Amino acid sequence: MGLEERLPGGILLSTVETVAGYVRKGSLWPATFGLACCAIEMMSTAGPRFDIARFGMERFSATPRQADLMIVAGRVSQKMAPVLRQIYDQMVEPKWVLAMGVCASSGGMFNNYAVVQGVDHVVPVDIYLPGCPPRPEMLLHAILKLHDKIQQMPLGVNREEAIREAEQAALAVPPTIELKGLLR
């Protein structure tokens, strides 16, 4: 004799966090930050063949104040890093970052002083998407993985604490230019 048997039909048992996550995952507004060839693949996901609109992303936002997902597609130079951080800070909460491509994830083949070796040294990244450039199907798969992550995210004070810890961990990692071994 469980609780489900005592309740009348049509009653849903859930938490506020689960319902909020379910609603939030279907209404992402991405801000495009296309810096290289990955941006071409990102643009093709909005076309009729891949149709990113079926996942609630009807339009790509040109302003950070109306976006909650930043897709960083391509390499980030040292001069571009403060601009990227400023755009991230202007985005509304809750916000997520997807590093698209090897250049955004780890600097790619550009291992020099002018390129940031991974966008996670500038902003906290939620999803890493490998490839050079990754196919649109891979971007859609990464967005679906982000949907799963969003649905399980905590709310309120718990979320702020999780974000603070992730940001501190990301900024504490040394850049690959300072690492020794096979990377150099």
From Swiss-Prot:
Sites where the protein binds [4Fe-4S] cluster: 37-38, 103, 132
InterPro entries from the xrefs?
NADH_UbQ_OxRdtase-like_20kDa (IPR006137), NADH_UQ_OxRdtase_20Kd_su (IPR006138)
Note on cofactor: Binds 1 [4Fe-4S] cluster.
Disulfide bonds listed in the record: none
Q: Does the keyword DNA-binding apply?
A: no
| Reaction(s) catalysed by this chain's protein | a quinone + NADH + 5 H(+)(in) = a quinol + NAD(+) + 4 H(+)(out)
Membrane-traversing stretches: none
Where does the record place it?
A: Cell membrane
Q: Could you tell me the membrane topology recorded for this protein?
A: Peripheral membrane protein
What's its top-level EC category?
A: translocase
- Keyword Transmembrane helix annotated: no
**Gene Ontology biological-process annotations:** aerobic respiration; electron transport coupled proton transport
According to its UniProt record, which cofactors does this protein need? [4Fe-4S] cluster
EC number(s) recorded for this UniProt protein:
7.1.1.-
Which keywords, in A-to-Z order, does the entry hold? Answer: 4Fe-4S, Cell membrane, Iron, Iron-sulfur, Membrane, Metal-binding, NAD, Quinone, Translocase, Transport
Looking at the UniProt record for this protein, which Gene Ontology cellular component terms does it annotate, in alphabetical order? plasma membrane; respiratory chain complex I
Q: Listed GO molecular functions?
A: 4 iron, 4 sulfur cluster binding; iron ion binding; NADH dehydrogenase (ubiquinone) activity; NADH:ubiquinone reductase (non-electrogenic) activity; quinone binding
Belongs to which family? Belongs to the complex I 20 kDa subunit family.
State the oligomer form and interacting partners. Answer: NDH-1 is composed of 14 different subunits. Subunits NuoB, C, D, E, F, and G constitute the peripheral sector of the complex.
HAMAP family documented for this protein: NDH1_NuoB (MF_01356)
* PANTHER family the record matches: NADH DEHYDROGENASE, NADH DEHYDROGENASE [UBIQUINONE] IRON-SULFUR PROTEIN 7, MITOCHONDRIAL
General function of this protein: NDH-1 shuttles electrons from NADH, via FMN and iron-sulfur (Fe-S) centers, to quinones in the respiratory chain. The immediate electron acceptor for the enzyme in this species is believed to be a menaquinone. Couples the redox reaction to proton translocation (for every two electrons transferred, four hydrogen ions are translocated across the cytoplasmic membrane), and thus conserves the redox energy in a proton gradient.
User: What's the protein name?
Assistant: NADH-quinone oxidoreductase subunit B
Organism per entry = Mycolicibacterium smegmatis (strain ATCC 700084 / mc(2)155)
Q: What gene name is given for the protein in this entry?
A: nuoB
